Amino acid sequence: MPAVGLGLWKIPKDACDRVVYDAIQTGYRCLDSACDYGNEKEVGKGIKRAIDDGVVKRDQLWVTSKLWNTYHRKEHVKAACLKTLSDLGLEYLDLYLIHFPIALKFVPFEERYPPEWNNTDKPGMVEDNVPM
């Protein structure tokens, strides 16, 4: 695992593929992503371009992503990981982490955030007691 990496949080979608490509071209080999960042498709475009242009091979990169809070149940983990792989355009991740150790009730991938976070005067969390 490379000692220095690029965190991909808050990189705007319209700049993300260029930022990732430029970072790889500069020498970054560790990319830290997450489905919650909302830009994994664009990250994947930057990775693909760097690979297609011969800047790097896939096995020279260390790509990390993270499982979001609403997908902690065992029946959702594989689907969440496969969605991340599809969005990134990759066949594998080097590391897949639990983004935050609080399990929330399931919300479909398209929504990602529980409705009680956004559609209420009193935002809150409905935790899900996920067995370990």
Where do the PLM segments sit?
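N-terminal binding-site loop/beta-alpha segment at the start of enzyme catalytic domains
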Residues: 1-61, 75-79, 91
